[in-house]
């Protein structure tokens, strides 16, 4: 190996190492704080948990109602992601494969929704949910999550589906497949990498969503995990130890999902480039 190549590899490894430390250090710090009490953290913010208080997780799950918040987040996010996958893939398939007069108008209308900041839609969504009796309900929050993530889901899937060769669809039609048959038997199997990408991105984004949830949910028994964590941070109460425990409970599912599906995510994000 030439000296220049060795130098480039050393520089690349150094950059990756620095990034890993910068990205991982805050997570490690929160993990250590999650095993310490607030008084211990106040006395030594960067101290090692000795002894580690593992019982804090059980207490957070039951006494602090994190179990309820976790269930609410799971129901809302999973239902929203399922709806996004079905509706987004069908819409992307329709606009990618079938050309009609207003095809591009619909495309740019959906794409433009990605550009606008979410604060612009909060008031209108609040009024719609109140009007239809969906304010302060899990269903209402789930529908809002579908609305805010659908443009990005559609954009990713449409770009992938549009690159599927037309010959595949012609062959499926010759074999007797209906329009829905083409979608279920051809588009979905081929588009699995892109669909997996949208599922992971939507899970991560919606699991950590706070802005819409804090406006649209008022009852404590309907709070999501981000709202539940904020209960321990206020003017009269600041339980840093329990906040750290709640943060670890919140991020563990995201870490597990990414660990198991990261290969599909990378493959899906690069598939359209390699086509």
Named regions from a protein language model:
Residues 8-275:
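A structural signal for multi-pass alpha-helical bundles of membrane permease subunits
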Residues 1-6:
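Short, Lys/Arg-rich, polar N-terminal cytosolic tail immediately upstream
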């Amino acid at each position: 190996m030439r000296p220049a190549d060795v130098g480039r590899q050393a520089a690349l490894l150094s950059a990756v190492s620095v990034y890993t430390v910068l990205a991982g250090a805050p997570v490690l710090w929160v993990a250590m704080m999650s095993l310490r009490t607030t008084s211990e953290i106040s006395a030594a913010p960067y101290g090692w948990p000795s002894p580690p208080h593992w019982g804090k997780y059980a207490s957070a799950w039951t006494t602090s109602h994190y179990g309820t918040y976790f269930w609410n987040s799971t129901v809302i996010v999973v239902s929203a992601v399922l709806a996004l996958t079905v509706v987004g893939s069908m819409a992307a398939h329709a606009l990618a494969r079938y050309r009609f007069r207003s095809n591009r108008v619909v495309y740019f209308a959906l794409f433009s929704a990605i550009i606008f900041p979410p604060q612009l839609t909060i008031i209108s969504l609040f009024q719609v949910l109140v009007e239809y009796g969906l304010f302060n309900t899990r269903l209402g929050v789930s529908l809002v999550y579908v609305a805010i993530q659908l443009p990005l889901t559609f954009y990713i899937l449409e770009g992938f589906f549009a690159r599927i060769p037309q010959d595949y669809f012609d062959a499926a039609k010759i074999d007797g497949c209906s329009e829905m048959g083409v979608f279920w038997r051809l588009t979905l199997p081929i588009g699995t990498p892109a669909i997996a990408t949208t599922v992971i991105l939507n899970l991560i984004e919606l699991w950590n969503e706070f802005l819409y949830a804090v406006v649209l949910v008022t009852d404590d028994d309907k709070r999501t995990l981000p709202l539940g964590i904020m209960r321990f941070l206020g003017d009269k109460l600041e339980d840093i130890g329990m906040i750290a425990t709640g943060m670890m409970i919140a991020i563990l599912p995201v870490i597990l999902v990414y660990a198991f599906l990261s290969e599909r995510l990378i493959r899906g994000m690069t598939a359209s480039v390699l086509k």
